[in-house]
């Protein structure tokens, strides 16, 4: 079982799919990594030898920001927006959509479950 960037790659999948289990590597980037490391992207992950795993590891660590470092960069970027109190930072802080979507009826994913307002029907009479 290959271990890259602290993640065990799923051994029964093709390399182009197995690499997507690493945070920060999608399908396109997985193909790029395979091409740079001169490894067939359709090769099964459990068939990799140590030399190929080391080449993959070297390409990923030298050229891409992945896993913990990428997560911390994203968190720092969001924190910076919240600190400067720009529109996007305020929306992050309030837990609302950032990109102009309507919030009167939709945005349930971002806002969470509905919160019922007590005595709303009585007050509307």
Swiss-Prot record:
Disulfide bonds: none annotated. GO terms for cellular component: cytosol; small ribosomal subunit. Residues 95-125 are annotated as: Disordered. It comes from the Bacteria. Keywords: Ribonucleoprotein, Ribosomal protein, RNA-binding, rRNA-binding, tRNA-binding. InterPro entries: Rbsml_uS13_C (IPR027437), Ribosomal_uS13 (IPR001892), Ribosomal_uS13-like_H2TH (IPR010979), Ribosomal_uS13_bac-type (IPR019980), Ribosomal_uS13_CS (IPR018269). The keyword rRNA-binding applies. Pfam families: Ribosomal_S13. GO terms for biological process: translation. One of its GO terms (molecular function) is tRNA binding. The keyword RNA-binding applies. Belongs to the universal ribosomal protein uS13 family. Located at the top of the head of the 30S subunit, it contacts several helices of the 16S rRNA. In the 70S ribosome it contacts the 23S rRNA (bridge B1a) and protein L5 of the 50S subunit (bridge B1b), connecting the 2 subunits; these bridges are implicated in subunit movement. Contacts the tRNAs in the A and P-sites. Part of the 30S ribosomal subunit. Forms a loose heterodimer with protein S19. Forms two bridges to the 50S subunit in the 70S ribosome. This is Small ribosomal subunit protein uS13. It comes from Borreliella afzelii (strain PKo).
């Amino acid at each position: 079982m290959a271990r890259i960037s602290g993640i065990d790659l799923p051994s029964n999948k093709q390399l182009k799919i197995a690499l997507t289990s690493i945070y920060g590597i999608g399908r396109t980037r997985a193909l790029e990594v395979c091409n740079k490391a001169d490894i067939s992207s359709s090769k099964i992950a459990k068939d990799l030898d140590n030399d190929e795993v080391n080449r993959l590891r070297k390409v990923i660590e030298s050229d891409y920001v992945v896993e913990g470092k990428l997560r911390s960069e994203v968190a720092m970027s969001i924190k910076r927006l919240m600190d400067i109190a720009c529109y996007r930072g305020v929306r992050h802080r309030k837990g609302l959509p950032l990109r102009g979507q309507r919030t009167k009826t939709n945005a349930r994913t971002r806002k969470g479950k509905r919160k019922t307002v007590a005595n709303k029907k009585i007050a509307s009479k």
